[in-house]
Amino acid sequence: MTEAIINEGSPLGYSQGYSEDIDAIRQREYPMLSDTTYLDHAGTTLYAKSLIDSFSRDLTTNLFGNPHSLSASSQRTTQRVDDIRLRALRFFNADPEHFDLVFVANATSAIKLVADALRDSAHGFWYGYHVDAHTSLVGARELAQAGSRCFTTDEEVEAWIAQLDADRTGAAQLFAFPAQSNMNGRRLPLRWCGRIRDRTKETATTYTLLDAASLVATSPLDLSDVSAASDFTVLSFYKIFGFPDLGALIVRKSAGHIFAQRRFFGGGTVDMVLTQDTQWHAKKRSVHEILEDGTLPFHNIIALDSALDTHARLYGSMGNVSTHTRFLARTLYDRLAALRHFNGERVVHFYMGRSPDFADASAQGPILAFNLRSSQGGWIGKSEVERLASVKSLQIRSGTLCNPGGTASQLGWSGADMLRHFSAGLRCGDDHDVMDGRPTGILRVSLGAMSNLRDVEAFVAFVEEFYVEKTPNVCSVVPSAADDSLQAGFYVESLAVYPIKSCGAFKVPDGQRWEIRREGLAWDREWCLVHQGTGAALNQKRYPRMALIRPHIDLARGVLRVVCGEASSEQKTLEISLRREDASLVTTSLCQNAAKPSTVCGDQVVVQVYSSTAVSSFFSTFLDVPCTLARFPPQSTTRYTRRSLHSRSSTAALRRQRPVEESSMPGSFPSDTPLSRTPEPPPILLANESPILLISRSSVNRLNETIKASAKKAVAADVFRANIVVAENLPHQLANTERPYIEDRWESFTVGPDRLQFDVLGSCQRCQMVCIDQCSGERRDEPFSTLAKTRKVGSQIVFGRHAAVADGVDGISRTVMVGDVVRPWYPE
């Protein structure tokens, strides 16, 4: 449908008024979009190539000095800043007789300036804000000494305005609301500002603050009617132009007196300062002069000049952008709303309030908020959708979208619900997608000036390919063999240890028995690389070159030998002692104060950091990231298997059912029923979720058959980063009868001649990290794309099984070896 629209030419509203066809603009101005679909313009839009070229020419042609000096270069800067300030006011039709513009870092900084000023007034202030407010608007309530109120509906606001008293005295009042919800694009009534002023008169102390950051990204803001305009308007220019990173506070001059009580002053905001016998200072007069502390970000302000020029040349006006983006949003909304599963159930559940009217510029902006549902009504996890979208080069946003009130309201969560979720571990930005049967966040798609119909088509095609169920899911059944002698056994095909978390594997040599501990294979994930600035553990998702860091465990010499990149005669090697108490730790310099906190998979973990510059330089140079090596402390009990997996393992601890001869259903998944008793979960070191990860060669083979059927390249088993790979020991006559995914039915298994017992804890949820080639460090879209179609359980994409050594096996040998026999057990 969309392709037909493209081929027919530009429909009414599509890039209307632009300097040329939008596809031509994109090809020339936005080369960064050549291999990606960008749908997060509400976060930031994109800068044009010619904007950067123009700004670069400006900087290399002109000499700009600090504007606080009187030199020629400084005066040039001052003149340009003054001109651009006026130009920015005119961009919003704001008469400089009635408005002043203060340059700030972003909209949040502008909000804080207003809230700080009212806090410093004699009686403080009362604060009211709309439920659809951005987090930064909500945060201002903490400064309101006279109290605050969240208005949960437009009707509540109207009722409050109706009872405002023009003669009230005491603390000032500030009412803040977004011109457009950054969550779903709903546009709120701008008439509120004028109505509040009419009710309270000019002499009253009730002010309005308009968060215009989301609105102005794709729509004109007209401040020409002074009587109807807000007292304070905040915005960020990068939302409009992509660059520069700069914000503005537009102040209605009649309200500028609130800043007179501001105590702090910075360089450039005063005419004189006395510091010795008398402590006195004289402030400058204009609003922007007393608020712009210190040296302005004058290069960013100068860049705004190029941004205004470029935007006008390419798009003509903000009105053109508004028409173009609302047409695209309407098209996308209609296409998504039409998607149905095989049984007629809707695929997309929108959070758009009343039916969005994209034709009405005062009602709806080009933002869509929604979640996806299965044919049975189950919620598809937002994190899983965003991960898969990233693999397919689609950039979207998920979560609470920095709009806590609007999101909670749309999802039906009360404050008590949210507190309960927080106590259960829910945090902003995590992957707790569904709690108590309801989503914890929302998916957001937003369009911008340079979006086109192909962006719309790409996202619709993505949802159709991966989330529209065209037929019921059917699990295949492997028939049980009539002759038990023909049944396949299993054996350990390979063992892999990952000494440094998220780095390459050390393959245990054939014929060598390897110790296995409660925490997993010996030396597995005992080290990690931590960012020297944040303390967070690095991972391949962000730094795929970590796959090329290849450790080797030399037990004979007692060292961990690390090599980076491809082998060469000049390649350097780092050796770390395996012994914690070894004297060599002095040279590799284990941190003298022993421990510092680090973040691993959301957990706060105490690690021991190597402070040697040689160690940090070795890894930092290769990854081009400031990092160093850290080790999990001995006898630490700070990390355990994830609770969701541990609850499943309780069943296996009590039930040991039939061995491999039992017929099974690969492709289906056992129901994990937690027991009432909860023994201590298995400990882990720096692994993500469990001590051991197991995969099956037969399952990898089946997955690759599916991948190759789509004319794509098969993947190696090592992309799954398993500790144990098991294979079927098939008799010759059953060579073509592998049983892929049979491990999904395993409840427990034994390994080796001593039958070392393992409990299966659950299936391994996969992310886009499996798309990193472990030999080259390159990203691909497989196998995650195929897994998303063939291995989805509810909202999770799974492959492989988590396991741990069973309780009560201390009396037997805890070793495994390549070639050991594996005997699985199945539930009844």
From Swiss-Prot:
One of its GO terms (molecular function) is pyridoxal phosphate binding. The gene is hxB. Residues 638-682 are annotated as: Disordered. Keywords: Molybdenum cofactor biosynthesis, Pyridoxal phosphate, Transferase. The keyword Transferase applies. HAMAP family: MOCOS (MF_03050). SUPFAM superfamilies: MOSC N-terminal domain-like, PLP-dependent transferases. It comes from the Eukaryota. Belongs to the class-V pyridoxal-phosphate-dependent aminotransferase family. MOCOS subfamily. It comes from Aspergillus terreus (strain NIH 2624 / FGSC A1156). Its cofactor is pyridoxal 5'-phosphate. This is Molybdenum cofactor sulfurase.
